[in-house]
């Protein structure tokens, strides 16, 4: 079962917010503010999807399958990950943007870089270390995107559980 309450809005033309609440599990999934002064630069702060893999950052409503691929479930903080099922989300600060517009909705380069607590949906940080993620894609021809991402972090109090991941992706539509 899945039921979501999603609220979002614009405070100004450059400042927006979003809240996403899962009704059946009573879990707050997203709560962030986003400042976007330019298309090439935005800053997000709060609870959000981490910028690891293209699929993790997409809305489930655009998938051609029922759920995430097994690879993303393992790598991006879903079931089977060392962090447990965190929905690919965490608390943190993320910067990113799009560069070199090629058409109405397309850009040659997209990027995101984030610093996160590393504790997933939990509000409590498990250690003093922060996790880092980076993602970028290039679109050399219309419809073809190629990219790479990396996630570097430590999970538990004594820093013995390493959560370092890398990925590459190609999508054509």
Language model: regions and residue ranges:
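Outer membrane beta-barrel
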Residues: 1-121, 126-133, 137-152
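Detector for outer-membrane/organellar transmembrane beta-barrel domains
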Residues: 137-173
């Amino acid at each position: 079962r899945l039921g979501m309450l999603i609220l979002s809005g614009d405070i100004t033309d450059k400042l927006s917010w979003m809240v996403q609440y899962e009704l059946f599990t009573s879990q707050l999934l997203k709560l962030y503010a986003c400042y976007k002064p330019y298309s090439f630069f935005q800053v997000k702060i709060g609870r959000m999807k981490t910028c690891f893999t293209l699929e993790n950052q997409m809305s489930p409503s655009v998938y051609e399958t029922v759920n995430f691929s097994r690879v993303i479930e393992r790598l991006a903080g879903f079931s089977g990950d060392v962090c447990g099922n965190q929905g690919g989300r965490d608390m943190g600060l993320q910067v990113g943007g799009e560069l070199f517009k090629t058409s109405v909705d397309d850009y040659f380069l997209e990027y995101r870089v984030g610093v996160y607590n590393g504790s997933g949906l939990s509000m409590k940080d498990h250690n003093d270390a922060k996790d880092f993620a980076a993602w970028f894609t290039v679109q050399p021809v219309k419809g073809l995107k190629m990219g790479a991402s990396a996630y570097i972090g430590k999970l538990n109090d004594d820093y013995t559980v390493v959560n370092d991941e890398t990925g590459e992706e190609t999508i054509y539509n």
